Amino acid sequence: MKSMDKLTTGVAYGTSAGSAGYWFLQLLDKVTPSQWAAIGVLGSLVFGLLTYLTNLYFKIKEDKRKAARGE
């Protein structure tokens, strides 16, 4: 019975991956290269902003620790 459970789990994951791959390929066909370029530019700006905010968060946290220690 245990092997049947593993088999059905594998089939379910395989079906899910196949379905996700199909929809991903459909998305790739609908977006033009110029749209992908715009998505890339916007994505890089978003990741840059997230990096800046993460750095700012940790710098503030570090400053609070230094102030608590009296440095």
From Swiss-Prot:
Family: Belongs to the lambda phage S protein family.
Stored InterPro entries: Lysis_S
Keywords: Cytolysis, Host cell lysis by virus, Viral release from host cell
UniProt cross-references to Pfam families, sorted A to Z: Phage_holin_2_1
Other facts: Encoded by the cryptic lambdoid prophage DLP12.
UniProt GO molecular function: pore-forming activity
Protein's UniProt name: Prophage lysis protein S homolog EssD
Source species, domain of life: Bacteria
GO annotation, biological process: viral release from host cell by cytolysis
